[in-house]
Design a protein with these regions (language model features):
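Conserved NTP-binding catalytic cores of kinases and kinase-like/nucleotidyltransferase enzymes
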Residues: 1-109, 244
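Active-site acidic catalytic loop and adjacent metal/ATP-binding pocket
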Residues: 37-54, 58-60, 214-264
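Activation segment
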Residues: 65, 118, 247, 255-257, ...
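Short, flexible/disordered intra-domain loops and linkers
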Residues: 68-78, 127, 279-288, 359-364
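ATP-dependent phospho-/nucleotidyl transfer catalytic cores
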Residues: 72, 123-142, 148-232, 243
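Active-site activation/catalytic loop segments of kinase-like enzymes and analogous catalytic loops
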Residues: 85, 261-313, 339-356
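Conserved short submotifs of the Hanks-type protein kinase catalytic core
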Residues: 108-120
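ATP/Mg2+ or Mg2+-diphosphate-binding catalytic cores
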Residues: 321-369
């Protein structure tokens, strides 16, 4: 009988014993094991890094009953199972581009995954204005492979519908539908964080702009009704581990079937936030790299998507002349739209980005926002 046969929220002491029990294939040196909470560990879950004196290590991630960002948010603890299974599928579609998952535990709502502490969290690195020349190539490959290969263009339609059923979390979709695709435009639940000097601008340009509301409503309903491909679901620079020679995408708990452009738009928006931060310090070299990376990410996505489509398409009607171009035009349109909603929600919504909030000069922050 194990004390981990019933759910409870672990602390750093519990997690060492838990790791020994659940990750037994790793030859741990028990006497030298330690655990800490890493500095960057997201808004929802509880994350621990466990290691020993012989070079073995693992990340343990547990879903709590409440989200870390707000006790009012109580998404299902099943999100840990969801993330683990999505990561394993993404590893099949884009090998080596996500952390390896050692196990997931549906009782403790926890998983063990590859320790990527030899990588930087990309947002942290870009706050230091570090540059990563291969990022555009890596992230475009990841998006093309995970999005296209999980779509009806390639998959057997019955198999794809099974994945739609399997990878749906009403609680997490509800967070996206409210925090990203509604509240930044009306503050309906009084959770927005608006920078005081920008209140008049936000009221005029976001809260009172009915034409904008119409376009966001279209994007929201596309997100809710178009199960186009399996998304990472929260593909920002805080969900990317990076080194000069490699990129790994993590935090896939918001993964669901929705429009491809939601993922691609998130990447572009978060690069723009990095550009804003660089602009605030007049770092021309960094800003130039970010702009080049945005262009290369889009261009490489277009190029690779077209090539992979031709190689992998199985649906006969998707081979009809002109269909590929029509289909891809929709992805690019959605990319632009969802880049906009990400820029809005990360500026005035519940979860602001440090790229902007750490700009100390008021005029420069106003300009960035």
């Amino acid at each position: 009988m194990s004390r981990f046969d019933h759910y409870f929220q672990m602390n750093v002491d519990d997690v060492i014993e838990y790791t020994l029990e659940k990750a037994g294939e790793i030859p741990w040196d028990r006497d030298s094991m330690e655990a800490v909470v890493p500095p960057s560990h997201g808004n929802l879950n509880y994350v621990y890094r466990v290691w020993d004196g012989k070079g073995h290590s693992i990340y343990i991630k547990q879903a709590g009953t409440e989200a870390r960002i707000s006790k009012d948010m109580k998404p299902s603890r099943d999100r840990n199972r969801l993330e683990s299974e999505i990561l394993m599928l993404e590893d099949r579609f884009a090998p080596g581009m996500v952390p390896h998952v050692y196990f997931f535990d549906t009782v403790m709502c926890a998983c063990g995954m590859e320790d990527c502490s030899d990588y930087a969290v990309m947002r942290d690195a870009m706050l230091r204005h570090e540059t990563f020349p291969r990022f555009a190539d890596d992230v475009s490959t990841f998006m093309v492979n995970t999005l296209l290969l999980s779509s009806d263009i390639v998959m057997d339609h019955k198999d794809k519908k099974e994945l739609v059923r399997k990878f749906i979390s009403p609680d997490l979709c509800d967070i996206t539908e409210k925090l990203v695709l509604m509240e930044p435009y009306n503050d309906l639940n009084k959770r927005n964080n608006v920078y005081g000097p920008n209140e008049d601008f936000v009221k005029r340009e976001l809260y009172d702009d009915q034409a904008l509301h119409l376009e966001v409503a279209k994007l929201k309903f596309r997100f809710m009704t178009d199960a186009q491909a399996l998304l990472q679901g929260d593909l920002h620079t805080g969900s990317i581990f990076i080194r000069q020679d490699a990129t790994k995408i993590f935090d896939s708990e918001f993964g669901t079937y929705a429009p491809m452009g939601y993922d691609t738009g998130n990447v572009i928006a978060n690069l723009i936030f990095a550009y804003d931060n660089g602009l605030s310090t007049d770092d021309g070299m960094f800003c130039g790299w970010v702009l080049k990376t945005i262009e290369e990410t889009v261009d490489l996505f277009i190029e690779k998507f077209g090539k992979k489509y031709d190689e992998a398409v199985t649906e006969p009607m998707a081979k009809v002349k002109g269909f590929k171009e029509w289909y891809f035009d929709g992805i690019l349109r959605d990319t632009a739209g969802y880049a906009g909603t990400e820029l809005h929600r990360r500026t005035v919504g519940m979860a602001n980005v440090v790229d902007v909030t750490t700009i100390k000069d008021e005029k420069k922050r106003l300009l960035a926002e």
